[in-house]
């Protein structure tokens, strides 16, 4: 349960004067509904279990400098049955934190467009998390940096983009994804496809996984760099694409 937001934006546009916003524990900086825009803020600093921008049945636009969280279970942007367009940088370091969360049960397709840079670290922290029983399309044009996972359990990995099963989620990556040791760049168990365009760059460290895909299709373009395997741990080889359950991989990468 979140406390009342600092700003309530309904079918409106709010333009700040490069202000900084500090969000208390369990707080929300801006709650948005309808066609709304929140622009020109400088830095949103998140407390524990707090949210920078919360969109509900909205087509929201987020244009600022940085959303940053270092405490547990913070959320940069939450979209519930919403379209999201974000150009702000997001940096999350607290355990079980999410840069952008989108849950869609609306029955209509929702679009998530991110051009901001995302940097994540911490146990079970995810850059962009997608779930729900209705379809979504994600287009990432920013750079995503997934730092090393320090937890020994793979279930606690740090992940750049995660698509849960339950609906068709198509992920299109045009940007650079840097995957640290034992981490995952894109992890999709939805019915949709993962596409890396010809502008995409995927860098995978030792013991890392670039793209993990269950079923569907991976259209791999751009450039993929996989580090040499140095670790002596069992089953720890770095992988550009790891596919299971009949996934089709179309490889046009360099």
Task: Annotate each language-model stretch with its function.
Residues 1-50, 54-97, 101-183, 187-254:
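Surface-exposed loop/turn motifs in large extracellular/passenger domains
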């Amino acid at each position: 349960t979140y406390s009342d937001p600092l700003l309530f934006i309904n079918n409106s546009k709010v333009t700040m004067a490069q202000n900084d916003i500090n969000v208390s524990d369990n707080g929300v900086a801006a709650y948005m509904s309808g066609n709304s825009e929140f622009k020109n803020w400088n830095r949103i600093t998140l407390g524990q279990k707090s949210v920078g921008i919360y969109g509900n049945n909205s087509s929201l636009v987020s244009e600022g400098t940085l959303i940053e969280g270092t405490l547990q279970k913070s959320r940069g942007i939450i979209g519930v049955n919403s379209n999201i367009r974000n150009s702000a940088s997001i940096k999350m370091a607290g355990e079980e934190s999410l840069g952008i969360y989108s849950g869609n049960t609306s029955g209509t397709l929702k679009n998530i467009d991110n051009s901001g840079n995302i940097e994540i670290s911490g146990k079970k922290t995810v850059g962009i998390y997608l779930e729900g029983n209705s379809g979504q399309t994600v287009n990432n044009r920013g750079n995503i940096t997934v730092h090393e996972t320090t937890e020994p359990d793979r279930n606690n990995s740090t992940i750049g983009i995660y698509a849960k099963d339950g609906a068709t989620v198509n992920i299109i990556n045009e940007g650079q994804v840097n995957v640290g040791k034992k981490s995952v760049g894109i992890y999709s168990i939805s019915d949709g496809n993962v596409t890396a365009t010809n502008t995409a760059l995927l860098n995978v460290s030792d013991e890392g996984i670039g793209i993990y895909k269950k079923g569907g299709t991976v259209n791999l373009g751009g450039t993929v760099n996989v580090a040499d395997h140095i670790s002596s741990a069992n089953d720890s080889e770095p992988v550009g694409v790891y596919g299971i359950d009949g996934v089709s991989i179309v490889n046009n990468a360099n």
